[in-house]
Design a protein with these regions (language model features):
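A sequence/structural signal of beta-propeller blade repeats
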Residues: 1-119
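C-terminal closing repeat unit and adjoining cap/tail of repeat-based domains
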Residues: 117-235
């Protein structure tokens, strides 16, 4: 048999009062593994597709569909439900994506979905939810509490808008690994408006990360002509 090529999709830490561990999610095939200090081997926690992963407040979270799961460490590590979709949120594995983000210590989820405009054309829409861990539910949110969120296909980060003059608060910035970036560079949650970022970089330049998008917006580096296939992974 030939060697299997594994691609790291997400990595995070579990660091609470009872345990410390490293969690790694490999895609294609999807498998979540975990190891604690002193372990001789990785333990398989979950086989299947996870749509987003993030570490927040010493916990490791992931999405199965649009349900938010938490990695629970005990003698047998396992995923437990942290926030369940109330079934009022429609999720399509083919057309939608979900993105967890640690927003200054508060866990949030961005739902990227497809809808139709008045001319029946397909367009992207973005719904944001706070993950209420006490209630175990997703609560609709209309802002990022004054912060800005930079979203890539595999990683999403939150930054303080006031730290950078060129960044708008309560705004979602799309990474160059999303096709709609050419028409929707940034999306304001307050007024639901979108605006194209001044960006001459080619959508065919891969791999591209959310860090690339963040750098462009902060320093105004909208032109990458002359750069040869930048290696800007999300790690």
């Amino acid at each position: 048999m030939g060697e299997m090529s594994l691609e790291v999709y997400g990595i995070g830490l579990v660091d609470d009062a009872s345990s410390m561990a490293v969690a790694v999610y490999f895609s294609d095939p999807g498998v979540l593994v975990v190891a604690k200090p002193g372990d001789d081997a990785w333990a398989v926690v979950y086989n299947g597709t996870l749509y987003s992963t993030v570490s927040s407040a010493g916990r490791f979270y992931c999405c199965i569909g649009i349900d938010v799961m938490m990695l629970h460490m005990d003698q047998q590590p396992r995923l437990l439900m942290a926030a369940e979709n109330s079934k009022s949120i429609r999720f399509s594995q083919m057309a939608h994506s979900v993105h967890l983000v640690d927003n200054a210590g508060e866990l949030m989820l961005v739902h990227r979905l497809t809808c139709h405009d008045s001319q029946n054309n397909h367009k992207r829409k973005y719904e944001v939810y706070k993950v209420d861990l006490d209630a175990g539910a997703l609560v609709s949110a209309k802002s990022f509490d004054g912060r800005a969120v930079f979203m890539g296909r595999y990683r999403t980060i939150s930054v303080a808008a006031e730290a950078f003059p060129s960044i708008a608060a309560d705004t979602l910035y799309l990474g160059c690994d999303f096709a709609e970036r050419t028409s929707t560079g940034r999306y304001n949650l307050i007024d639901r408006s979108s605006r194209l970022i001044n960006d001459d970089s080619s959508a065919e330049m891969y791999p591209c990360s959310i860090i690339h998008c963040l750098s462009q917006c902060i320093w105004g580096m909208g032109n990458f002509n002359g750069l040869e296939h930048p290696q800007c992974n999300d790690a």
